[in-house]
Amino acid sequence: MDVVITALGPDNVGLADPIIHYVTGQGARIAEIQMYDHDEEQLFAMLCRIELDPSRLELTRKAMALVAEHTRLAIRVWSPDERAERPRLALCTTYLPQTSRTILQAIADGHLRADAAVMIGNRRKCEPLANEFGVPFEMIGDDEGTPDERAMVQLLDRYQIDYVVLARYMRVLPPSTCWQFAGGRIINLHHGLLPSFPGLRPYQDAFASRMLTYGATCHFIVPELDAGNQIINQQTYTVAPGTSLSAIIERGQNENEPACLLEGVRRVVDREVKLHFHRVVVT
């Protein structure tokens, strides 16, 4: 089975050794390994993807828990094969409900083979939507909308989340959160076509460039901001010359963005694609 081990904590010598020695001693094949020392923060981060005999998964979890105690690393052992039939999703939201509603409706209609385990928000705007679909809502933002990142990680663990879906979640996840759920577990919707229109105002930037084709991008999040675009899906629409910016944004938010994210999430949960190193590959 495919197993992803992530480790994050204070930097020191020899942190990777006990992890690598254990998994190789179990006869696992290492398919991918990444290690980073963030010198400025004195932080060590590691991802190790292995192919492991399913009967050894729980033993590996217990062994990694012991390694975590001795090294002060936060270690997670996750396999997409455990809940392959219905992976558990966390929908992260801020203000706009359209993309989350489309995901929840697709699950309810049986078009998306997953379970919405929790909705996490740094604002309460989407809480009524969570209540409508019977999904627990967890608020992690303060009065200014600043999220408690530690609380988010704790919630993702508590709800046993397989994939984190940033459904127009208007905050940048810190590298520590990205590392703890690395390996293609964080899916983001960007409301513009990457790499042409990054940033917070892609509609306005495309409009200023006199574009007639607009779009959205669904991609994996990786800890390194300069690692490129790990694109899962892109969806576009074309408007007539003279179409107002407000009409373009309305169509994008209500139709194009939800469709783009839904198809991207479907490709991931149906195991059509996965993240390998920094590339999206067909499985």
Language model region names:
Residues 109-114, 179-182:
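Short, conserved loop/helix-junction motifs that constitute active-site signature segments
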Residues 123, 148-150, 159-283:
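Donor/substrate-binding cores of folate-linked one-carbon enzymes
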Residues 131-159:
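Adenosine-nucleotide cofactor-binding segment
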